[in-house]
A protein has these predicted regions:
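Active-site groove signature of glycoside hydrolases
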Residues: 119-140
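Acidic (Asp/Glu)-rich catalytic clusters
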Residues: 13, 45-46, 77-88, 119-123, ...
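N-terminal binding-site loop/beta-alpha segment at the start of enzyme catalytic domains
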Residues: 1-86, 229
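Beta/alpha (TIM)-barrel catalytic core signal, keyed to glycine-rich beta->alpha loops juxtaposed to Asp/Glu
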Residues: 135, 139-327
Length: 327
């Protein structure tokens, strides 16, 4: 199980060579049982994928499932397939306690506990890439980065990254890392797709790509690993007759409808589908972007993966890329 070299991206500041799509694992062990999860992971590896995303809390909100079932399921797959060295595993910690959501958990004790728990769930340390799942703006950024450096020094994790941080906090982290001579964040994960959600449908502790964040990434060249990169299937679902499904209602705007129409027209020309084109547009941006894709079946995954085979004309590439940068 090795990823094709032509589809790999070296994350700057690391030795991690990752596939241009990352497989999201939020359904592992819950909406997808273990057999279905293994089958999806097998398909991903066969296609050339090697970058998998999970989190300590994934599916902990689902009644009756194993706690941290996504990590546990991924860990069992890695062991069963004997492919740990071939994969780049990313997980996240520091999420507020779902049972008692009293606020952020980026204190040293909580981060250490989460990182060690994730390493055990995934089959052993070190974790390739460890995201801070939520920010705590009240905590000095240096305190957070110092904790992460300790985890690197102890070989619990190899590299660390941000998730749902503001541009100001990312800039402060970059400044602290430079002044301290440490690596700092090597990636940022936030919501980003060609379909911007309605402003009132973005939770206050989540982050969607905006002008300030985009300028930060342009300046600092920090890679983006966006979640909801397929807009939860909005572009395909919006083509169906009848009302917009509730699952994608947050994207039901006139702007997104126009984008969907354009994608469907181009998809017919390129003999692909709208979601694949939307992913291609992200990958073709001026900054390094590795979209996280969420799929239920191997066929859905193959359709998403087909974006890597799409070769857009310069004018179409410029047009679609402009849509990703104009929210």
């Amino acid at each position: 199980m090795t990823a094709a070299a032509s589809t790999l991206l070296l994350l700057p500041g690391t030795d991690l060579h990752v596939s241009r799509l990352c497989l999201g694992g939020n359904r592992f062990g819950s909406a997808l049982d273990e057999s279905e999860s293994f089958a999806l992971l097998d398909t991903f590896a066969e296609l050339g994928g090697n970058f998998v995303d999970t989190a300590l809390v994934y599916a902990d909100w689902v009644p009756g499932v194993e706690r941290s079932c996504s990590e546990h399921t991924l860990g069992r797959w890695l062991t069963t397939r004997d492919c740990r060295k071939a994969m780049v595993v990313a997980t996240k910690g520091g999420h507020p306690d779902l049972a008692h959501p009293a606020g952020p958990r980026l204190d040293r004790a909580s981060l250490r506990a989460d990182a060690h728990a994730s390493a055990e769930n995934l089959g052993g340390a070190p974790i390739d890439l460890y995201y801070l799942h939520r920010d705590d703006p009240s905590r000095p950024i240096g305190d957070i980065l110092d904790t992460m450096e300790t985890l690197v020094d102890e070989s619990v994790i190899r590299y660390y990254a941000a998730s749902n941080f503001s541009a100001d906090r990312l800039a402060a982290a970059a400044q602290y890392a430079s002044a301290s001579g440490i690596g700092g964040f090597v990636a940022n994960q936030l919501e980003w797709s060609l379909a911007a959600p309605k402003a009132d449908r973005v939770a206050p502790d989540l982050t969607y790509m905006d002008a300030g964040l985009l300028e930060f990434h342009r300046t600092h060249r920090l890679p983006v690993v966006p979640y909801s990169a397929q807009a939860k299937g909005y572009f395909e679902k919006s083509r169906s007759a009848g009302p917009i499904p509730q699952s994608v209602e947050r994207y039901d705007t006139a702007r997104n409808a126009r984008t969907a129409q354009l994608l469907h027209r181009l998809a017919d020309e390129y003999e692909t589908d709208a979601t694949a084109l939307a992913l291609r547009a992200l990958i073709d941006c001026e900054i390094d972007i590795v979209p996280v894709v969420g799929c239920r079946t191997g066929e859905q995954l193959r359709r998403s993966w087909s974006c890597l085979d799409v070769s857009l004309s310069p004018s179409d590439s410029e047009l679609l890329t402009s849509l990703t940068l104009s929210h």
